[in-house]
């Protein structure tokens, strides 16, 4: 009996570690964890179910940075939930750990299959129609999901808008076979897909990039050079912050996320 109890406690602790720091908010939203089978490892999707959804016709998918459910990632996820969005979250560090440890890269075809499966699971678990448009939001490595969504036609059709926070320069977990490379898909000397050129493939899909002025990877000024001027489908928000995690300006970053979401919804006639 004692052994069984010990095993149950260990399993509960392991399960909770996948969404550490995220808590339901009484009367506002409920945090729910559901397993997603992806390759040889079991990972989880974390759902925020608002008690009174403000945008029931949309699904927001949030991908964390390497730190998992901490810092910017937990702040943004919980804010979206409090605002009434139906959110499905994934811990990028856990999802990509086997790939990064193996020192290999997934093909865009393999990655697309996994992402499409995750989107289907999320819509099913939340009771949403298959046709529900998805708004992708990600921080740091999780923001590369935005670029990945641009790479594959099937994913592009499923995305209704995208917000990238702390966007880095390259994707280090994907490979694009030469036959799949259109001119917008560029790789560096190490074969890593370059994010900013790939964003052009999003076409008419509204994209917002939120970047810190002192981001050590790609500061906001350089992001502006890479993106060019704002357009009807592209916006760059430059946040005067200390570092990659928007230190000293977290509230400003959250306000920009809200503005970007309003802009995306307005561009879709909402």
Predicted regions and their residues:
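Short, surface-exposed "cap/lid" segments of acyl-processing enzymes
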Residues: 52-85, 89-92
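Active-site-adjacent alpha-helix of alpha/beta-hydrolase-fold enzymes
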Residues: 81, 214-235, 242, 247-248
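Cap/lid segment of the alpha/beta-hydrolase catalytic domain
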Residues: 91-109
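Alpha/beta-hydrolase active-site loop
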Residues: 104-128
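The feature captures the conserved acid-bearing segment of alpha/beta-hydrolase catalytic domains
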Residues: 172-224, 228
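C-terminal catalytic histidine-bearing segment of alpha/beta-hydrolase fold enzymes
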Residues: 232-270
């Amino acid at each position: 009996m004692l052994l069984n109890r010990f095993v149950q406690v260990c399993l509960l602790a392991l399960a909770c570690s996948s969404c550490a720091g995220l808590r339901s908010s009484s009367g506002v939203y409920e945090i729910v964890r559901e397993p997603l089978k992806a390759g040889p490892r079991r990972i989880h999707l974390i759902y925020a179910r608002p008690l009174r959804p403000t945008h029931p016709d949309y699904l927001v998918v949030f991908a964390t940075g390497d730190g998992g459910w901490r810092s910017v990632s937990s702040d943004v996820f919980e804010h979206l939930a409090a605002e009434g969005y139906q959110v499905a979250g994934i811990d990028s560090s856990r999802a990509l750990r086997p790939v990064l440890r193996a020192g290999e890269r997934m093909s865009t075809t393999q990655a697309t299959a996994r992402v499409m499966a995750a989107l289907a699971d999320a819509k099913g678990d939340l009771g949403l129609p298959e046709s529900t448009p998805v708004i992708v939001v990600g921080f740091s490595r999780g923001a590369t999901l935005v670029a990945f969504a641009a790479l594959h036609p099937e994913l592009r059709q499923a995305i209704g808008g995208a917000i990238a926070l702390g966007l880095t320069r390259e994707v280090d977990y994907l490979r694009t076979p030469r036959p799949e490379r259109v001119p917008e898909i560029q790789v560096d000397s190490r074969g890593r897909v370059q994010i900013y050129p790939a964003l052009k493939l999003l076409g008419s899909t509204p994209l917002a990039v939120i970047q810190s002025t002192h981001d050590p990877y790609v500061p906001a000024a350089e992001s502006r050079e890479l993106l060019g001027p704002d357009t009807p489908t592209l916006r760059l928000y430059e946040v005067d912050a200390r570092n990659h995690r928007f230190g000293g300006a977290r509230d400003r970053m959250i306000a920009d996320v809200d503005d970007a979401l309003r802009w995306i919804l307005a561009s879709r006639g909402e």
